[in-house]
Amino acid sequence: NINIIEVDLPLEEEKEDYNKRLENFFSKNSKIHHCITFTSKAHIVGEFLQRTNRRNIQIMGYDMVKKNAECMRRGSISFLIAQHGYMQGYNCVEALFRAIVLKEEINPVNYMPIEFLTRENVDFYQRTQI
């Protein structure tokens, strides 16, 4: 039986506000052992868990940004999904060019690669450029 419980962490809050929200959330939901964040801010939760010595919670986050990588190396983030922002941006501009300038029909589906990073492979990750 899976139960999904959400906590809202607005992107522009102060660290103290995040700490209050997270302390309240994890105190009320002490049986939570897995989290996922859908922004590049997984480090906010990872840093909180490390600071409060909550070691039995796994986090999966998005984006290989410096703070997320640091949390992963320390073990407070378990997994990261790395996306290729440069490639996504390039493909968007190219699709616009082909549609507007060349008047070509554009495929509405454009699958992009992602990479699943762990503590063991994070130091070997090389962000691919165009």
Language-model features and meaning:
Residues 2-4:
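Terminal, non-globular segments
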Residues 11-67:
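Hydrophobic alpha-helical
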Residues 36, 60, 79-81, 117:
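Hydrophobic/aromatic beta-strand patches that form the interior of the parallel beta-sheet core
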Residues 44-46, 68-71, 89-90, 125:
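Short active-site-adjacent structural elements
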Residues 50-54, 76, 98:
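Short, solvent-exposed amphipathic alpha-helical segments in soluble enzyme
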Residues 65-77:
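Flexible loop/hinge segments that line or gate small-molecule binding clefts
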Residues 74-86:
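Short beta-strand elements at the ligand-binding edges of bilobed clamshell
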Residues 84-130:
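Hinge/cleft segment of the Venus flytrap/periplasmic-binding protein
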